[in-house]
Swiss-Prot record:
The keyword Transcription regulation does not apply. This is Uncharacterized protein y4mL. The chain crosses the membrane at residues 5-25, 26-46, 53-73, 102-122, 144-164, 170-190, 210-230, 234-254, 274-294, 309-329, 332-352, 360-380, 396-416. It comes from Sinorhizobium fredii (strain NBRC 101917 / NGR234). The keyword Membrane applies. It comes from the Bacteria. InterPro entries: DctM (IPR010656), TRAP_DctM (IPR004681).
Amino acid sequence: MTIVMIIVFCALMMLAVPVGYALIIAAGVAVLFNGYLPLSIVAQQIYDQTQSFPMLALPFFMLAGTLMLGGELGRQLLELASHAMQRWRGGPLSTTVVSSVVFGGVSGSAVANASALGSVLIPWQKKHGFPPALCAANNATSAVIDVLIPPSIPMILFSLVSGVSVANLFVAGILPGILMAASFVFVCWFVSVRRGYASQPSQTSRRQLATLALKSLPAVLLPVLIILFLRFGLATPTEVAVLSVVYSLALSLLYYRDLTWKRFCDNVVEAGMATGVVMLVIMGSAAVGWVLTFDQAPQQMADWVAANISSPIVIILMMNILMLIVGMPLDMPPAILLLGPIFVPLADTIGLDRVQLGLMMVINLGIGLYTPPIGTTLFISSSIAKSPLGETTRELWPFFAMAMTLLLAVSFIPALTLY
């Protein structure tokens, strides 16, 4: 059944069938191929997956993100980051990195981050004399920092398939997220110094910068509040997601006073459409996961690896390579939902903590978002910058090297995630 399902899924993907539908059809064909199982099992698995209580967190986190990024708040955050980094060599480039960290605590989506930030910052960076390809590469890679900063949609999905606490995953992502941001800022500085890009004179006084920081503080506090509420057990992930929406509405209505009824409706529709896409993938992955479990494929793989490969280091490296390969053609939600049930038993076999595995998977699949030839944020950023894909790829390698270094560190240094 598993082999038939994989063949059908690959064929449907080559025909450009949407991932969610491809997963459901592949699982259905596999069940029919068995000959003894009713097709209603697929429908039952799809329905059961939608009854998960933690699943309610997804639409609310997405709505909170669209509410906060759609108005004055987004402009304030961008203005703060640009003025704060302007004095640095490569400051306009570093602004993208810092903005990704700040926006990551609000949006929770790397693709949305790449589009929202790139459309504003890339034209501004080009006006400051930075080449379009470098601007695109910087935006494509920096957007992925988003998936490490709470609230992270990929981490919520991994918790669904692994049983790991969402709070533990959110906390574990903070240090790797900061390290990735710092390494990308270093790349921006190094490239600027090596190529002779001058720092930009700042027109902002310290008093004005402090004023901008105070205006943006309520938004920056959101990820901090999420961590505190989850870490100390004050609320469940779903309750925190609802509170995030209430917090976002309060800021937009009472603090920034820029929320209109039309924008609210547009934001609700936008969040609903994004949630629908993810939910379809989740439902399809539930059916595929049932077929894999019925065939005992994850356990058989874990047993085979344990019997034939004695070194945990080799196993972890193989897992990383497979995740990188899968992350190139597949978006993060389906990749996590497909690989999670396979790798969790394998991680348990070699004593790899599930939280550490979750961070490995998120970073790996995040790198896949900008890895040629099929990288979502790479294509988005190149399109915004009007840069040929080949030129953007050449500028990508210093950022890629830093991300791979962090990936290896997270894979083999548990203290980076288990603190």
